Amino acid sequence: MSDIPFTLDQLRILKAIASEGSFKRAADTLYVSQPAVSLQVQNLEKQLSVPLFDRGGRKAQLTEAGHLLLNYGEKIITLCQETCRAIEDLQNLQGGTLIVGASQTTGTYLLPRMIGMFRQQYPDVTVQLQVHSTRRTAWGVANGQVDLAIIGGEVPAELQETLTVLPYAEDELALILPVLHPLAQAETIQKEDLYKLKFISLDSQSTIRKVIDKVLSQGEIDTKRLKIEMELNSIEAIKNAVQSGLGAAFVSTTAIEKELEMNVLHIAPIKNVEIRRVLSVIINPNRYRSKASAAFIREVLPQFSTHPDALDPERLFANPYSSNNGDRQGDGKDGKGSIEIDSVT
């Protein structure tokens, strides 16, 4: 097997089938016909002389050889993408791509403003914003699928030695009430008042929920006594429910700026209790860092930093393979952007 027995297209097809769980959905994702996908897999299996899928069940299941090829295939695809981006930087071509990851609240309310500022300075750079759970976002950075990310939770333990994690900003979490709620008239509310409220919350596994429970417990508030009447899967749904008078909720203050201006929600300070969490910037120091990501780190991140121990951008450029040049890439006005949103955090 001296020649390489597969192509990048075949690796992309394998990855799509593994992700989608079926040949048909993979074909739809790749905008090709199902017979074309099946033929490529058959050719690949013939070249490798091993089956890559168990075809007995309703869902396409990878064999041991399939898992092995998928593992290396994802690395090959990522390295090819990094190579193309490095060559773009070397030739100083117009354009380029910046891929930013974020957990839900950060990605929904903070990152669009940051990306807007970046696009004003670099309109020809394509920006992709991927909004997922903290865990999935961290793995995206580790695997080289995301240039950098801003998260509100903790990096998974298994990645803490792989990624560089630096404090970036403080995010204040506030108790919100309907504007006509009786407690909305008080300057502050007592801890005991919390036990009388009906709460609307994200699910118990969300990052914000865990932070709130931890801080309230530190403030000698028994979170088990709080009445969770409803669990929703997005901050927007929670805000709408509170506006409709269905209960109270804890949300990031960055998520309710518009509602406060319109006077449709009320923040109720809790006496002697402040709820804050630290937002962190994460990068993979062992991956190539493009000029676009270097410019974003140096020029945009400091404009929004609020943490007392906030990052020094130069600490993110220790890797000799990173791009230390944040020069402007192109001066066109046809920049593109995309947003990918997944699960709650």
From Swiss-Prot:
Segments of this protein annotated with the region Disordered: 311-345
- Gene3D superfamilies membership: 3.40.190.290, Winged helix-like DNA-binding domain superfamily/Winged helix DNA-binding domain
Which keywords appear in this protein's UniProt record, sorted alphabetically? DNA-binding, Transcription, Transcription regulation
Q: Which InterPro entries match?
A: LysR_subst-bd, Tscrpt_reg_HTH_LysR, WH-like_DNA-bd_sf, WH_DNA-bd_sf
Q: Which GO terms describe its molecular function?
A: DNA-binding transcription factor activity; transcription cis-regulatory region binding
Pfam families found in the cross-reference section: HTH_1, LysR_substrate
Q: Where is the HTH lysR-type domain?
A: 6-63
DNA-binding interval(s): 23-42
Task: Report the record's Gene Ontology biological process terms.
Answer: regulation of DNA-templated transcription
Feature: compositional bias, Basic and acidic residues: 328-339
Family note: Belongs to the LysR transcriptional regulatory family.
Q: What is this protein called?
A: Probable RuBisCO transcriptional regulator
User: What is the organism field in this record?
Assistant: Synechocystis sp. (strain ATCC 27184 / PCC 6803 / Kazusa)
Which gene produces this protein? rbcR
